[in-house]
Amino acid sequence: MLEELRDIMARLRDPETGCPWDVEQDFRTIAPYTIEEAYEVADAIERDDMAALRDELGDLQLQVVFHARMAEEAGAFDLKDVLDSISAKMIRRHPHVFGDGASPGWEEIKAAERAGASEDGSALAGVASALPALLRAEKLQKRAARTGFDWPDPDGARDKVAEEIDEVRTAATDADRFEEMGDLLFAVVNWSRKLGIDPEAALRAANLKFEKRFRAMEDIAGEAFKGLSLEDKEALWVRVKRS
């Protein structure tokens, strides 16, 4: 089946007989679609929609095949190389399953892979700059924590959040407020991490809760909703929240 999808992509990318849109794409133009498809997979999982998950996984697989095809055209690698590479990586990272159970642990193996792939010896090496900011903040903090640079308990992280709130409040310029708001968001992610809470999952849940309540307000008020005063909307919000 994967071979069929690979052949379809080859035909779509054919300069003479393929699809003009597919032919003109490159890695950079396709990358946003790859990210979008990954989020749509996560959304289907969040909604527990198996039919949608099936379709979205297919769309995500298409992105892999698309990138692999472009790489093959450039003479860099092909789809088989991609599959061989991930298979070898999974075997290497699971010596307790595929080899000597006394082999190094997961983190040691990953650290060795990073060291072999880059001259950057930092503990933060390999944290992709293109990750969503919330996720990247958490990954950077986790990496730093492994070196011992971390709050000993959640209280220190909580106090840092309070400190950053004050700094946002007292910032003198827009540029200062921008910087301090970034520090505040970073601190909130850190506090969440210290409490054992996935900040991305927590924010997704908060988004869904807000959306559900706001839609309920719209349903109750109908077409009159937009014309309600802020006071009436706040009263409606409290009503929905209590229901």
List each model region and its residues.
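Flexible "arm" and connector segments at domain edges
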Residues: M1-L57, L62-M181, L185-S243
